[in-house]
Curated annotation (Swiss-Prot):
Keywords: Kinase, Plasmid, Transferase. InterPro entries: HipA-like_C, HipA_N1, HipA_Ser/Thr_kinase. The keyword ATP-binding does not apply. This is Putative kinase Y4mE. Belongs to the HipA Ser/Thr kinase family. It comes from the Bacteria. GO terms for cellular component: cytosol. It holds the Pfam family Couple_hipA. Its EC number is 2.-.-.-. CDD domains: HipA.
Amino acid sequence: MTVRVLNVWWDGRIVGQFTQDRHGDIGFAYSEAWLDDENTLPLSASLPKRAEPFSRRECRPFFGGLLPEESQRLVTAQALGVSPANDFALLDRLGGDVAGALQLLPEDQEPIEAGPLPDQQPTPLDEAGIVRILDALPTRPLLAGQEGLRLSLAGAQSKVPLVLIDGELALPVSGQATTHILKPPIARFPGTTENEAFVMRLAAAIGLDVAPVEPRSANGRPFLVVERYDRYRDADGVVHRIHQEDFCQALGVPPETKYASEGGPTFKDCFELLRRVSARPATDVLKLLDAAIFNLVVGNADAHGKNFSILYDDQGPKMAPLYDLLSTVAYPDLSPKMAMRIGKRVTLAEMDADGWQTFAKEAGVGLPLVRRRITNLVDSTAEAVARVLEDTSDLYIDSARINHFADSVAGRAKLVRLSI
């Protein structure tokens, strides 16, 4: 078996080569042209530009972090007929459209030239077509194996990237940059579509930077449509990819250890990362601070290192909009413990003034600032809950369930205020 190669493309240029040798070991090396151009960026904060190739241990957190996780990875691999542990084989089949600006393609392929979306003639989906996708995702995550589709997204939840044209969802043509993500409900937990839509819109209502979401349904089947923040459409209607990486990728942490309790990033690690990488660290530190407080208020205990990202746009690296915000405490079968401790506290019941003092030190900010952010965010959340419910009540299939979520958030907001 010879060395297998995937060219890593970024905006029409080869960044380098992702390889797998005859022993199954993966590696990555930047191309000479990419290294010689002082205007090019590294793929990741964990993969600085250098001539020496990167080993499996060094490059796997980034490349493995482009793929689905946990059961989604297993079922995807089964659908493709490859080993779930084989990152190269999975990216060979799925790497045509991933999170960020990259495309991973075989040596004999090049990216298609971008053009206005309608000119590329993606396949439109009627309600029956959407239902077919919803039915297929449990056994074929990301529609893995469907001819012409090479799509990947990280995460343990079922989802598939699509394009949106004039408000209508469509399957992309081969190599086309997707613009939105369709997320079906999580089968084990009722109401996750309504839950995530409400929490994401609540975050937007109080001024947090979040990915826009829209709850929809097809033949009575609910799903969520999330706008991709790592894409932009120019004046001619051409969709461009923007590079991004999650905090685990940036810190060189494999997706299997994304939780802080397993060696994954802590909030201290995340704040230090932003100060090191961000072009506007003061702004982004406050953005992460607010996100931590908001997640405690709404009961999103699953905010681990892969649920925060860095976006590399033309203004420099910055913290990406928030995504995957869900009130996980609404489901008794899920652990109420926060994925990343806040000042050594893992639940709202444990949170106290000493916890906030420790958290302020981890964030590298003063306790008075943390208290002001808590007060402002709690007050804004309490005021916005009813307004968000009223403004979006017609979008939710299960209004009783979303009212329950809203009541829970309002109650938690009061407890967070008392904890300071």
